[in-house]
Curated annotation (Swiss-Prot):
InterPro entries in UniProt: Ribosomal_uS11, Ribosomal_uS11_bac-type, Ribosomal_uS11_CS, Ribosomal_uS11_sf
Quaternary structure and partners: Part of the 30S ribosomal subunit. Interacts with proteins S7 and S18. Binds to IF-3.
Protein keywords: Ribonucleoprotein, Ribosomal protein, RNA-binding, rRNA-binding
PROSITE patterns: RIBOSOMAL_S11 (PS00054)
PANTHER family on file: 40S RIBOSOMAL PROTEIN S14/30S RIBOSOMAL PROTEIN S11 (PTHR11759)
Coiled coil: none
Protein name according to UniProt: Small ribosomal subunit protein uS11
Function: Located on the platform of the 30S subunit, it bridges several disparate RNA helices of the 16S rRNA. Forms part of the Shine-Dalgarno cleft in the 70S ribosome.
Cellular component GO terms held in the UniProt record: ribonucleoprotein complex; ribosome
GO MF annotations, alphabetized: rRNA binding; structural constituent of ribosome
The organism's place on the tree of life at top rank: Bacteria
GO process terms (BP): translation
Amino acid sequence: MAGEKNAVGSSKKKKYTGGVAKAYILSTFNNTIVNITDEKGNTLAWASAGVSGFKGTKKGTPFAAQMTAASVGRKVMGIGVKQIAIFIKGPGPGRETAIRGLQSSGLGITTIKDITPVPHDGCRPPKLRRV
């Protein structure tokens, strides 16, 4: 028929049967990215502040980080994830609010670990802004 199309992929969502999933939060001054993986590192769901509908300087706000984390949390709850271990990276303003967003979506948090890279006197930092 003219209105029907054959789907190439399967329309069924796969259920997550593993143990504790891992949530990686990258929080910079300009954006927040949340990625949820299984134990092997395969991505289950991800979102950023831009994907969540925020534009420009609003992407770097704590509210954008909370909404982004909550949307990813709802996605993986639909797949079947119940427990997550959080790995947070970066100095941005959305660090704590992203954790609260994941918690408010109904996910249980087992561990929180900060994996922000710290230089041992490596590269020279950029010059300070004068406004």
